[in-house]
Curated annotation (Swiss-Prot):
Subunit structure as annotated in this protein's UniProt entry: Homodimer; dimerization promotes ELP1 stability and elongator complex formation. Component of the elongator complex which consists of ELP1, ELP2, ELP3, ELP4, ELP5 and ELP6. Interacts preferentially with MAP3K14/NIK followed by IKK-alpha and IKK-beta.
Function as written in the Swiss-Prot or TrEMBL entry: Component of the elongator complex which is required for multiple tRNA modifications, including mcm5U (5-methoxycarbonylmethyl uridine), mcm5s2U (5-methoxycarbonylmethyl-2-thiouridine), and ncm5U (5-carbamoylmethyl uridine). The elongator complex catalyzes the formation of carboxymethyluridine in the wobble base at position 34 in tRNAs. Regulates the migration and branching of projection neurons in the developing cerebral cortex, through a process depending on alpha-tubulin acetylation. ELP1 binds to tRNA, mediating interaction of the elongator complex with tRNA.
Name listed for the protein in its UniProt record: Elongator complex protein 1
Organism per entry: Oryctolagus cuniculus (Rabbit)
Source superkingdom: Eukaryota
Protein localization: Cytoplasm; Nucleus
Modified residues (Phosphoserine): S805, S868, S1172, S1175
Region of interest: Disordered: 1177-1209
Keyword flag tRNA processing: yes
Pathway(s) per entry: tRNA modification; 5-methoxycarbonylmethyl-2-thiouridine-tRNA biosynthesis
InterPro entries according to UniProt: A-sol_ELP1, Elp1, ELP1_b-prop_2, ELP1_N_b-prop_1, HB_ELP1, TPR_ELP1, WD40/YVTN_repeat-like_dom_sf
Coiled-coil annotated residue ranges, if any: none
Keywords: Cytoplasm, Nucleus, Phosphoprotein, tRNA processing
Length: 1333
């Protein structure tokens, strides 16, 4: 759905040269034009309008002096730096334009009618006056000469296998006589010049020749190969015209055919058979086709037509039509009418061989025109809610308009057609947002027809419905109506006749103001901006007038123009990429350079064929796309693989060569973020990217909707709903409290319905009644309930592109599900509880803890009291629906848990249960006492806590059964709440609970339970086992033990405490309960409690113990500390040195591996491609054993292997980790030793062991300093550095990537991360004794 848009026009005329132009050719490298006349050859630069060379051929005798000479062909030869000229008299001349030297390289006595060079300029073909074809090499050496008329069909002659005869075949309505009809041949067309036509295929392997057969007088097309062997002859085609053009892509040969009532362009295959056609918009014998020309990429077919003389005084014209094809339909995209008289009569035209959409036209009077076209999609702006997403396609004198807001139909179908009196060249939509559905059409007669959408008193005859019409169908579409046609008033009509496309880039900026571009007549490097204003006139006049209210000249050729209706600015792009700015609301027509935020003028590095204006991060920017898929924002290239783009609202949508469509929000974006996102091969945000079909291009975006229209290369359409557009539109609807629109869109496009709440929980909970009233559908509300989940989808599935400022309002005492269910249920009960009965039931079921009992009770109420409301549901319907939400067995159990047997029977009847199974069970239950009945039900339902509650009310005779259930199900805490603490049942349960805790080795809790219920002996045993000596002695006091029993208990306790290294507690027990203070002192000395031992010595006045026990113990402890410190210091130093050595060895090994793995020589590319595969198998080979015993290793073996994972054995794989672990242990043990050293230093000083104290203090200080100095050297690497992923980027090299990869292979697992954190040393601990310094 694209049209051809004229970018620029280059023109020169009135060159002072003799004679009249006859033909022309192009020199692609210098960009000049070679024009031949009856006098000779001239070379003109179309930009500077200067004559570069003039080669007279009359003076050299190659052309006659009577001006009757004719040049039939000109060809620029790049490799020979010369120009080849062929004259009708038969001379082939080689001209060097640098030296002006002429050389006649050959002559044909019978004359030359056609000279045609192959596309590769290796061969040249001459058609002579003797009806022969001569093929020569590029050095003009003859290869072969053959007759142009051949009797043979060619090498590709069809083979008949003899199946059936013509006489026996079916001939349709013509009957059997058709088999005996003699085929007649129509002669050539009356206006046919009978000259041969030659055309080459794009690759130069074949050429086709159209000639008039001397026998039949009809045209035939023959195909020859490069070796000059005839391949095929076309089937007889009545009315075949002389025009011939082989499609460069090689598939079809175009020609023309006159039919009884029309004139067609027909296509031949290489085998000579017809394959398709399209009809020209003229009647038979109204025009003749002079020539057909394909552009370089086979996308545009130019048809050169000329009016035939019908009346004496009729004005004859020549037309150049540009036809394009899409979805197997041919569109007439442009029509250029020229006069057949005077300077504007066309002499020749040709496509540029390098620039595909550049057309060169040569007219009489030395008038030359050069047109540059590009593809464009003419669509409405989409800046307003009333915009219908219109897209207009030009097809001759018709405009095919598709309204994508209401219909999506594939081209060439459309919503409606606009019929105009002349072929259309340009179409534009109004830039005003409220008028964006109005469109203006510029036709070939330079009239502008304005169509406006609105109420019209009658149906406009120029507007015809397309795909939305039909008998019996009511059309809801408001079609536009023709308001008026405007004639543009030019200062000179002569310019319009010589250049039919005087105006380009037409834009409708205000209701009565247009902007258009025209090339300057004064200078080829200037453009003129015209401001066209509607001339006031009478309303009843059929035709209005547009006058040029103001004009301004711009240095440079304007090739594109785009508008922004919000800022009222227009961006004009010059051919060199420079951007100019024009504010259309300014009183004067003035332009200025477009500047970036830094104040510098913006210039695209390359000219762009599509430009748009967009607000990016609050700054208005110019976006451009080149024909080479390079995408620019201002003067910054952000991507080089963009095939199309569109700006919609605050979004930028792009399609790429990687067959993706990306959508970016421009509201808070920047050029750098867009550049980073488009250059990244992986897009993290799932909203941004989606895959599309290969070759897709953006057509338009439907406003206030989620539809993105894409067109495939063949022409068919595809509608996609881009996730970013969908979510953005849903968020807008939710912000406007438009729940119904949001819900319908989410349901259709499978967006999680949790977003309705999670987008703004507070607003949703405040508007739940609005939500219910808007949805107003029971099934839809149930669907909403069923999709609810506790997850916040705005943080997981649909994170907003910009962090939301909405505060998540959540009740700290409830969950999301409970809040929504309760709020919606209250709203539905207020609105209509009978209508919304099923959603109310769903709200109970969907809660975090399903309230099935309440649900069943509501269903039971429905059974007894059927409401009279017509919207109400019956109990049976409610129960059926409930069975869809909840498993029937679970529902049966919950109904049983209500103790309502009527409800149980109602549910059981809907289940698959056998009545023989549940009826006896229910009958048995009915016969039981109420409490025991409920106990039995709860026990059956495994609700044991409720079961013991009911059983406890049944009386003492059931206590044994209750106690057994308590023991079996471990319900001690719940059971203790059911009986008073003074009861015997309470004591029995407590004793059972304590025994259970003893079995679980929870001795202290067991002792507390026993003590609480008065079982002191059991409590003493439990406290004694766990070493709780205070509670043990308390229980002993309550048991009234004798002193002897208490002393024995004390010694037992002291022994257990000593085993647990609780020497101080053991000493207290021995001193206070066994009066054995000497043993207490020994235990204190063993526990290094020096000061407490001295206290007891002085308390009992046993000073002799100081000499006999205390001092020797202190000296012994001193020696042990010294030995320990020396051992730790030596271990630390040894491990540290080994760690540094291991690290150095690993670095060397990595470098060796890197050198070994780096590929060299001719196989480097192969190894680089397979390196990832090799490394992957290498890493997994350690664990690819097939021995099943390894996988079945017991947990004991696994724990053993885990302990052996870090081995200090030299050369082990993780030796460095084992050394770090050992060094960490040394540091921590030394840090914990500070308090002990401080205590022994005090007693060493007290007993005058100053030398030993100073030595211990100095040794400990040296050891600590050694450790502190070594910490930065040992813990240099962090875990993140050690496990870094391969670094990629513009600054990376092959070596750095491979080194990072090697580092990744040897990285540590996550569980060992804490080893790389240096241990913390508490420097605040005071351990030094200043008296020893």
């Amino acid at each position: 759905m694209r049209n051809l848009k004229l970018l620029q026009t280059l023109e020169f005329k009135d060159i002072q040269a003799p004679g009249k132009p006859q033909c022309f050719s192009l020199r692609t490298e210098p960009g000049t034009v070679l024009i031949g006349s009856e006098h000779g050859l001239i070379e003109v630069d179309p930009v500077t309008r200067e004559v570069k060379n003039e080669i007279p051929l009359v003076a050299e005798g190659f052309l006659p002096e009577d001006k009757s000479g004719c040049i039939v062909g000109i060809q620029d030869l790049l490799d020979q730096e010369s120009v080849c000229i062929a004259t009708a008299s038969g001379d082939v001349i080689l001209c060097n334009l640098s030296t002006h030297q002429l050389e006649c390289v050959g002559s044909v006595a019978s004359g030359i009618s056609v000279m045609s060079w192959s596309p590769d300029q290796e061969l040249v073909l001459l058609a002579t006056g003797q009806q022969t074809l001569i093929m020569m090499t590029k050095d003009f050496e003859p290869i072969m000469e053959q007759q142009i008329h051949q009797d043979d069909f060619g090498e590709s002659k069809f083979i008949t296998v003899g199946w059936g005869k013509k006489e026996t075949q079916f001939h349709g309505s013509e009957g059997r006589q058709a088999a005996f009809q003699i085929q007649t041949h129509e002669s050539a067309l009356p206006w046919d010049d009978h000259r041969p036509r030659v055309t080459w295929r794009g690759d130069g392997q074949f050429f086709a020749v159209s000639v008039v057969c001397p026998e039949t007088g009809a045209r035939k097309v023959r195909v020859w190969n490069r070796e000059f062997a005839l391949q095929s002859t076309s089937e007889p085609v009545p009315g075949l015209g002389p025009a011939l053009a082989w499609k460069p892509s090689g598939s079809l040969i175009a020609s023309t055919q006159n039919k009884p009532n029309q004139q067609d362009v027909v296509f031949f295959e290489k085998n000579g058979l017809l394959h398709g056609q399209f009809t020209l918009p003229f009647l038979k014998d109204e025009v003749k086709v002079n020539d057909l020309l394909w552009n370089a990429d086979s996308s545009v077919l130019a048809v050169w037509l000329e009016d035939l003389q019908r009346e004496e005084d009729s004005v004859l014209k020549t037309y150049v039509q540009l036809w394009t094809v899409g979805n197997y339909h041919w569109y007439l995209n442009e029509c250029l009418p020229f006069s057949t008289y005077g300077k504007s009569k066309i002499v020749s035209l040709m496509w540029d061989p390098v620039i595909p959409y550049r057309l060169h036209v040569l007219c009489q009077g030395w008038h030359y025109l050069c047109y540059d076209w590009r593809w464009t999609t003419d669509r409405s702006s989409g800046d307003n809610e009333s915009d219908l997403a219109n897209v207009a396609v030009i097809d001759g004198n018709r405009i095919l308009v598709t309204v994508f807001q209401q219909t999506v139909v594939p081209p060439p179908m459309c919503t409606y057609r606009l019929l105009l009196p002349h072929p259309v060249n340009q179409v534009t939509f109004c830039a005003l947002p409220k008028k964006s559905n109005d469109l203006a059409v510029l036709d070939a007669s330079n009239q502008i027809s304005v169509y406006k959408c609105g109420d019209s008193p009658s149906m406009d005859p120029t507007v015809k419905l397309g795909a939305v019409g039909g008998n019996g169908f009511k059309v809801s579409l408001r079609t536009p109506h023709l308001e008026k046609r405007y004639k543009i008033q030019f200062e000179s009509n002569e310019d319009q006749e010589t250049n039919p496309l005087k105006l380009s880039l037409l834009s409708w900026i205000e209701e009565d103001i247009f902007l258009a571009i025209c090339h300057s007549q004064c200078s080829p490097q200037q453009s003129v901006i015209h401001r066209l204003t509607v001339v006031p006139c009478e309303v009843d006049e059929e035709q209005g007038q547009l006058s040029v209210s103001s004009s301004i000249s711009v240095d440079g050729i304007i090739i594109s123009m785009c508008c922004n209706s919000k800022t009222k600015s227009v961006a004009l792009q010059l051919a060199d990429g420079q951007i100019l700015k024009y504010i259309w609301e300014s009183p004067s027509l003035a332009v200025e350079p477009w500047k970036n935020p830094g104040g510098f003028p913006i210039q695209f590095p390359y000219p762009c064929i599509q430009t748009e204006l967009a607000m990016i991060g609050g700054e208005e920017c110019v976006l451009g796309l080149t024909d080479r898929c390079r995408f620019f924002i201002n003067d910054t290239e952000v991507a080089s693989n963009i095939t199309s783009f569109a700006v919609y609202d605050e979004f930028l949508l792009l399609t790429t060569h990687s067959h993706t469509c990306q959508c970016y929000c421009l509201k808070d974006a920047s050029i750098k973020t867009l550049q980073a996102g488009l250059s990244s091969s992986h897009v993290s945000n799932g909203e941004i990217l989606r895959k599309v079909e290969r070759g897709s291009r953006i057509v338009t975006v439907v406003p206030q909707d989620t539809k993105l229209i894409l067109q495939m290369p063949r022409g068919n359409l595809e509608v996609v709903h881009h996730r970013a557009l969908v979510l953005a539109q849903i968020r807008k609807w939710l912000d406007k409290i438009m729940f119904k629109e949001a819900f319908e869109c989410m349901r259709k496009l499978r967006i999680n319905l949790n977003l309705i709440h999670d987008h703004n929980p507070e607003v949703f909970l405040q508007n739940v009644e609005t939500f219910i009233r808007q949805i107003d559908c029971v099934n839809h509300i149930n669907l909403f309930f069923t999709e609810l989940k506790e997850e916040d989808v705005t943080k997981t599935m649909y994170p907003p592109p910009v962090p939301s400022s909405v505060q998540q309002s959540r009740d700290p005492g409830g969950t999301k599900l409970d809040l929504i269910c309760d709020a919606l249920r209250v709203a539905m009960e207020n609105i209509n509880p009978h209508k919304y009965c099923l959603p109310i039931l769903t709200s109970h079921v969907k809660k975090t803890t399903p309230e099935l009992e309440i649900v069943l009770q509501k269903v039971h109420e429905l059974q007894g009291n059927a409401p009279s409301d017509p919207d109400a549901v019956s109990a049976e319907e409610a129960l059926k629906y409930l069975l869809l939400l909840v498993d029937v067995n679970e529902l049966y159990d919950h109904s049983l848990g209500t103790y309502d047997f009527d409800l149980v029977l109602m549910v059981a009847e809907k289940s698959q249960k056998d009545p023989k199974e549940y009826l006896p069970f229910l009958n048995t239950l009915k016969k039981m006492e109420t409490n025991y009945q409920r106990f039995t039900i709860d026990k059956y339902l495994k609700r044991y806590e409720k079961a013991i509650g009911h059983l406890s009310k049944c009386g003492p005779e059931y206590f044994s059964e209750c106690l057994n259930l308590i023991k079996d199900k471990n319900l001690y805490n719940e059971a203790l709440k059911l009986y008073p603490p003074t009861s015997q049942e309470y004591k029995d349960i407590s004793i059972a609970y304590g025994e259970h805790l003893m079995e679980e080795h929870q001795y202290e809790p067991a002792g507390l339970v026993f003590a609480r219920c008065g079982a002191h002996e059991k409590a003493l045993s439990a406290f004694l086992t766990c070493g709780s000596w205070q509670q043990t002695l308390c229980m002993a006091a309550q048991l009234n033990m004798t002193e002897e029993q208490l002393a024995g208990l004390g010694r037992t306790l002291a022994g257990k405490l000593a085993e647990q290294r609780k020497h101080s507690d053991a000493a207290i027990v021995l001193e206070q309960y066994t009066q054995d203070y000497e043993e207490a002192v020994l235990l204190l000395l063993e526990g290094a409690a020096w000061e407490e031992a001295l206290r007891l010595v002085y308390k009992y006045n046993r000073l002799d113990i100081i000499e006999t026990n205390i001092k020797p113990s202190i000296l012994e402890a001193y020696k042990n500390y010294m030995a320990f410190l020396e051992s730790q210091s030596a271990t630390f130093s040894r491990h540290k040195e080994r760690l540094l050595e291991v690290r150095e060895l690993k670095e060397r090994a990595q470098q060796v591996d890197l050198d070994d793995e780096m590929p060299h020589g001719q196989e480097a590319d192969l190894f680089s491609e397979t390196s990832s595969i090799v490394s992957g198998s290498e890493m997994s080979s350690k664990y690819s054993h097939s021995n099943s015993r390894i996988s079945a290793r017991s947990s004991k073996n696994r724990r053993k292997a885990e302990r052996k994972k870090h081995s200090l054995k030299e050369g082990s794989p993780l030796e460095d980790l084992a050394l770090l672990e050992a060094l960490n242990e040394v540091v921590q043990s030394l840090d914990k030793l500070k308090d002990e050293v401080y205590r022994i230093l005090k007693v060493l000083f007290l007993f005058e062991f100053d030398e030993q104290g100073r030595e211990l203090q100095k040794t400990f200080q040296d050891t600590l300093q050694l450790v502190e100095r070594s910490l930065p050297e040992i813990w240099t690497l962090t875990y993140q550095q050690n496990s870094a992923m391969p670094v990629l980027g513009p600054s990376s090299t092959a070596n750095s990537i491979m080194a990072s990869y090697q580092q990744q292979k040897t990285s540590v697992p996550v569980l060992d991360a804490e080893l790389f954190v240096p241990p913390k040393i508490n420097r605040k601990t005071q351990w030094k004794l200043s008296l020893l310094e």
